């Protein structure tokens, strides 16, 4: 570890191989003092795409990986978090809608660190058993087309980073590694980031990690495609990274206000998700639809995100998305769900029977 620290002190970048090895030491043998010094030294220098790709590889080397056997491409909708608008759980709802539209979804997520409700929190509120063993998540993806991977279950080595991260209390490279370390090795992803300046960096990293089709975006303070204003996108496709912006008008949805999509506790966000899947129209549905459309697009089921929007809408209006959520709850919990709760937007965590 001393070698890597000295390189940072001297202002030198690490190679991808060095970064991978450094992450291995961080997760296995480095002291808390060494970890803190390394992380802050890297933050002050600024991470390169080679370094971040190496860190991701180092994490994946010790992860509990799974390889679902599926037709087509696996897609993840995991973002970095850091939403300044405290919205509903958009990427969680989008994952369900995309799965109902025919996308095979390997959803990587965690409990909330930056908001009231993370993907794990709202899934738990809905009745999904979130801490399945890896082999059961693999079966979920293969059998029903969607699975949820709770990050600590698949990245147990990261447990030793909880203390140092809390003590540092600033954003570091670990805030962006979650979406880069999907335990299935999903080749297609839609990733929202908390800072526009991260879009191209993340796209470059994902290219180096061998991804095939990725959209990395930031919209008006959100790690989502925004319906409040324009969204900046870095898209990786066929080995080429391109930049462009998306507006609500281009996507055919109404421009919303921040108050229209505000979320709350896991229970409140679970209610909102069920209202959307039961067909309730409005700004919350619109932002879920455009983000689900992005997942449908990178999966290759539509030629553009705009062309994917009707597929997302149909998945909701036909109740396929609601039924997909029921499948996920029943598969993971082993219990039948309360249909009345699903159809009225009640919390399901205590309603499975």
UniProtKB/Swiss-Prot annotation:
Record's catalysed reaction(s): N-(5-phospho-beta-D-ribosyl)anthranilate + diphosphate = 5-phospho-alpha-D-ribose 1-diphosphate + anthranilate
Residue numbers binding anthranilate 1: 79, 110
Amino acids binding Mg(2+) 1: 91, 224
Amino-acid biosynthesis among keywords: yes
Listed InterPro entries: Anthranilate_Pribosyl_Tfrase (IPR005940), Glycosyl_Trfase_fam3 (IPR000312), Glycosyl_Trfase_fam3_N_dom (IPR017459), Glycosyl_Trfase_fam3_N_dom_sf (IPR036320), Nuc_phospho_transferase (IPR035902)
Cofactor: Mg(2+)
Any one Gene Ontology BP term: L-tryptophan biosynthetic process
EC number(s) given by UniProt: 2.4.2.18
Pathway: Amino-acid biosynthesis; L-tryptophan biosynthesis; L-tryptophan from chorismate: step 2/5
One Gene Ontology molecular-function label: magnesium ion binding
Self-association and partners: Homodimer.
Cited NCBIfam families: trpD
Name of the protein in question: Anthranilate phosphoribosyltransferase
Origin species: Methanococcoides burtonii (strain DSM 6242 / NBRC 107633 / OCM 468 / ACE-M)
């Amino acid at each position: 570890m001393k070698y890597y620290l000295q390189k940072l002190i001297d202002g030198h970048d690490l190679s991808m191989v060095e970064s991978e090895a450094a992450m291995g030491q961080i997760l296995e043998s480095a002291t808390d003092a060494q970890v803190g010094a390394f992380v802050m030294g890297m933050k002050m220098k600024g991470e390169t795409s080679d370094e971040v790709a190496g860190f991701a590889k180092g994490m994946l080397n010790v992860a509990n990986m799974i390889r679902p056997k599926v037709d087509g491409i696996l897609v993840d909708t995991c973002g970095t978090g850091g939403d300044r608008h405290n919205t509903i759980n958009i990427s969680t709802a989008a994952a369900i809608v995309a799965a109902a539209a025919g996308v095979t979804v390997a959803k990587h997520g965690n409990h909330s660190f930056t908001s009231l409700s993370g993907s794990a929190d709202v899934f738990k509120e809905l009745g999904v058993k979130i801490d399945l063993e890896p082999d059961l998540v693999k079966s979920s993806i293969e059998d029903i087309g969607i699975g949820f991977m709770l990050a600590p279950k698949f990245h147990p080595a990261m447990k030793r980073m909880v203390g140092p991260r809390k003590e540092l209390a600033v954003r570091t490279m670990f805030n962006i590694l979650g979406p880069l370390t999907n335990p299935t090795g999903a080749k297609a992803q839609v990733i929202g980031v908390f800072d526009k300046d991260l879009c191209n960096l993340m796209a470059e990293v994902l290219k180096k990690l061998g991804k095939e089709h990725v959209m990395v975006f930031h919209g008006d303070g959100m790690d989502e495609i925004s319906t409040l204003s324009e969204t900046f996108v870095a898209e990786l496709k066929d080995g080429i990274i391109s930049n462009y912006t998306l507006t609500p008008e281009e996507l055919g949805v109404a421009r919303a206000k921040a108050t229209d999509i505000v979320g709350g506790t896991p229970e409140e966000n679970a209610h909102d998700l069920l209202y959307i899947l039961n067909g309730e129209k409005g700004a919350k549905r619109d932002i879920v639809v455009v983000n689900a459309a992005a997942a449908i697009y990178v999966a290759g089921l539509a030629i553009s995100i705009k062309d994917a929007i009707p597929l997302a809408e149909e998945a909701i209006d036909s109740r396929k998305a609601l039924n997909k959520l029921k499948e996920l709850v029943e598969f993971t919990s082993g219990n039948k769900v309360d249909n009345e709760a699903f159809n009225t937007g009640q919390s399901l965590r205590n309603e499975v029977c």
